[in-house]
Design a protein with these regions (language model features):
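Broad gene-expression machinery/nucleic-acid interaction feature
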Residues: 124, 175, 241-245, 257-259, ...
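Long, charged, helix-rich clamp/arm modules that form nucleic acid-engaging surfaces
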Residues: 4-12, 16, 23, 31, ...
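Catalytic phosphate-handling regions of large nucleic-acid enzymes and associated NTPases
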Residues: 2-238, 303-305
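Residue-level signature of catalytic and energy-coupling elements of molecular machines
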Residues: 27, 50, 95, 179, ...
Length: 415
């Protein structure tokens, strides 16, 4: 039996209204606090907190490595209270050169592989910041961005990084929120910077004009892109579908037989899954003419060898592999990011404009900070100048007077 002592505090609510409000608050929390990147620095909160925790641990590129368990523990304990097991996979991805076009973390140890092998436990792996991450956090101590309290109000964390380079455009992002998702392609940093320079010189340029500077996605795993229509679509609208192909060449053996050598595969494709799919198509006779599939990948890079039977045309076999396996696959672009805390779909001009506006704000705040410091320093230097101009009189006064009287005289002289 439940005893209710204060019935005036009981509020009658419709369950539909409560569920609607609770679900909306939950979905917005996932969207803003977890799944979608900020258009300014291209990072999700978990990524930003990991990098900031490493910054506080002084894990600069020239310094030593630290255990990932220490980094994950500090991140979880100070900024991201969801446990080290949630933090570690995010840390690992920022160190994988097949996941990010420009990695933000320099990992030491087993950080997984393109075959889908898991990384070693965090107690065995070590990490430090890459130069790219340092550039993202450059001028953080010059009042360039706002800070806010962490989850338990014991310290502060940056709401965004100053971001010297357009991380969202060059590294892309992916995430699934409640009722929406994002899937943004990485690009070549030189091409992106050329596009930004063109925009600064001509802010009236349209999104389609960026095609003169940005050829298309620059996936870290290499490969080819088939056609330009998908690129044009997402440059103009923020949505598009890009067809990717792995890089393959036909080599001839001394005995006259041919083999297909794959050296690059589409982005986000697991190499082991590709091999299994090729074997499956051979067993089901969808692709005929393959006698052997070998993975000869090593330190020199990827090398997947498919031996073609005699009397079969290697080029025909390769075209069937494009058709029936993931050697040809698509990347669906959905440029959704947070703009002032609100999720928006952005075309290329929108993303560049937001980045340029943000950098303008950062540089303005940094300049004001440095000006204030210089003005404070100016007051001290002015005192030095007056002292040097009257050095003989000052020395005479100090020697002839007690300390309090000398201090009073010097203060009047400076005023």
């Amino acid at each position: 039996k439940i005893m209710i002592h204060d019935r005036s505090r009981i509020e009658l609510l419709e369950i539909e209204d409560v569920l609607k409000k609770a679900y909306l608050e939950y979905s917005m929390s996932v969207i803003v606090s977890r799944a979608l990147p900020d258009v300014r620095d291209g990072l999700k909160p978990s990524q930003r907190r990991i990098l900031y925790a490493m910054h506080q641990l002084n894990l600069a590129p020239g310094k030593g490595f630290r255990k990932c368990a220490k980094i994950a523990g500090d991140t979880s304990g100070n900024f991201h209270p969801h446990g080290e097991q949630v933090v570690y996979p995010t840390l690992v991805r920022m160190a994988q050169d097949w996941s990010l076009r420009y990695t933000l973390i320099n990992g030491q140890g087993n950080f997984g592989s393109q075959d889908g092998d898991p990384p070693a436990a965090m107690r065995y792996t070590e990490a430090r910041l890459q130069k790219t991450a340092v550039d993202l956090m450059s001028d953080l101590d010059k009042n360039t961005v706002d800070f806010h309290p962490n989850y338990d109000d014991t310290r502060e964390e940056p709401s965004v990084f100053p971001s010297k380079f357009p991380n969202l455009l060059v590294n892309g992002s992916s995430g699934i929120a409640v009722g929406m998702a994002t899937n943004m392609a990485p690009h070549n940093i030189t091409e992106v910077c050329n596009g930004i320079i063109a925009y600064i010189e001509n802010p009236e340029m349209e999104s389609v004009d960026f095609l003169k500077y940005i050829s298309g996605p620059d996936f870290p795993t290499g490969g080819f892109i088939i056609g330009k229509s998908g690129i044009k679509d997402y440059i103009e609208t923020g949505h598009g579908r890009v067809i990717m192909r792995g890089r393959a060449a036909i080599e001839r053996k001394d005995n006259g037989s041919e083999m297909i050598v794959i050296t690059e595969i589409p982005y986000m494709l697991n190499k082991t899954n590709l091999i299994n799919k090729i074997v499956e198509t051979v067993k089901t006779r969808r692709i005929e003419g393959i006698s052997d599939v070998r993975d000869e990948s090593g330190r020199q890079g990827m090398r997947l060898v498919i031996t073609v039977k005699r009397n079969y045309d290697a080029d025909t076999v390769l075209q069937k592999m494009y058709k029936y396996t993931q050697l040809q696959s698509s990347f669906s672009v959905n440029n959704r990011a947070l703009v002032k805390g609100i999720p928006q779909v952005l075309n290329m001009k929108d993303m560049v404009q937001n980045f340029v506006d943000f950098r303008h704000e950062v540089v303005t705040r940094r300049t004001k900070f440095e000006l204030d410091k210089a003005e404070q320093r100016l007051h001290i230097l002015e005192g030095y100048r007056i002292a040097l101009d009257n050095i003989d009189e000052i020395i005479k006064t100090i020697r002839a007077s007690d300390p309090d009287a000398a201090l009073y005289y010097l203060a009047r002289m400076i005023d």
